[in-house]
């Protein structure tokens, strides 16, 4: 557990340093050539998704030491090439880890750790020589490192796109072809879904962000919902106060088939561009 926390703090520091190096986000300059130049000159090691540390309680049930927790996520990416592969793509590795920590119980047990490595091809989406977003094709693995009846794992081929509507709004779509090899979670698609849509909004000064993520489950008109609000500490950093609400199934792998409704608060360090979900 100590190694996990130390790794999390180390990667947060790396992300803070990266935000100072890359002072200009792609959405601020829509010329395609300038966007490629920014990408090729930017650090190879970056944040991938949001990196956060939040704690909270269930909604609709009495909070107890067993159902209240701390959740944290670290997510990094290493770009392996410049944007000079076929179709102006670039090769990258990513690693994302989510932890669910029962800090209110005796001995502070880590309830579940979800490991999500992947390798993919990224692409800047350009229309009429204007940058309008990004996409990627990735092979992912996700598991919780447990054995016996507590083991959970699956693989998927993911296709995702994030498109800028303007400097304030972005929409995202992500779909996947699942390869379920975990004997204890053969019905995971019923709960973790088959595709995801999201919308991001942020103010002109980047001080306030709002995100809504909907993950479509297999049954008709059923979604897992995540709503996020963040407010920046100050204008010169990418650290934010963070509020996250989750409602549905599949928040963690161990309890993927158990319904959760959780409200948590803490802080988040965001990538320079809009967040990826």
Placement of each model-derived feature along the sequence:
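Long, repeat-rich segments with strong aromatic
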Residues: 205-210, 216-242
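Solvent-exposed N-terminal domain segments of exported/luminal and surface proteins
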Residues: 21-89, 100-102
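Cleavable N-terminal export/targeting peptides
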Residues: 1-36, 274-277
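C-terminal membrane-adjacent module
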Residues: 232, 239-247, 251-253, 264-268
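Membrane-embedded beta-strand positions in outer-membrane beta-barrel channels/transporters
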Residues: 69, 73-75, 116-118, 158, ...
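Outer-membrane beta-barrel "beta-signal"
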Residues: 260-277
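Outer-membrane pore/translocation modules
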Residues: 23, 47-56, 82-204, 212-214, ...
């Amino acid at each position: 557990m100590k190694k996990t926390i130390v790794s999390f703090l180390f990667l947060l520091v790396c992300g803070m340093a990266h935000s100072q190096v890359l002072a200009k986000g792609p959405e601020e300059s829509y010329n395609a050539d300038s966007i490629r130049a920014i990408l090729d000159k930017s650090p190879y090691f970056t944040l991938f998704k949001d990196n956060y540390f939040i704690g909270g309680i269930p909604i609709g049930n009495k909070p107890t030491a067993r159902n209240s927790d701390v959740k944290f996520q670290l997510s990094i990416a290493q770009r392996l090439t410049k944007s000079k592969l076929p179709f102006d793509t670039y090769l990258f590795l990513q690693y994302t880890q989510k932890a669910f920590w029962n800090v209110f119980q005796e001995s502070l047990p880590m309830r579940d750790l979800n490991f999500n490595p992947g390798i993919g091809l990224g692409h800047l989406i350009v229309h009429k020589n204007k940058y309008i977003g990004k996409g990627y094709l990735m092979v992912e693995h996700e598991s919780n490192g447990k054995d016996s009846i507590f083991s959970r794992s699956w693989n998927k081929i993911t296709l995702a796109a994030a498109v800028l509507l303007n400097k304030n709004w972005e929409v995202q779509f992500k779909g996947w072809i699942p390869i379920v090899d975990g004997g204890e979670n053969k019905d995971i698609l019923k709960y973790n879904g088959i595709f995801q849509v999201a919308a991001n909004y942020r103010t002109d000064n980047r001080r306030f962000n709002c995100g809504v993520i909907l993950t479509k489950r297999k049954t008709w008109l059923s979604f897992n919902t995540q709503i996020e609000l963040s407010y920046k500490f100050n204008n010169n950093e990418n650290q934010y106060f963070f509020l996250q609400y989750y409602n549905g199934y599949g928040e963690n792998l161990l309890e993927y088939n158990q319904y959760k409704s959780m409200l948590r608060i803490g802080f988040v360090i965001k990538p320079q561009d809009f967040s990826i979900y």
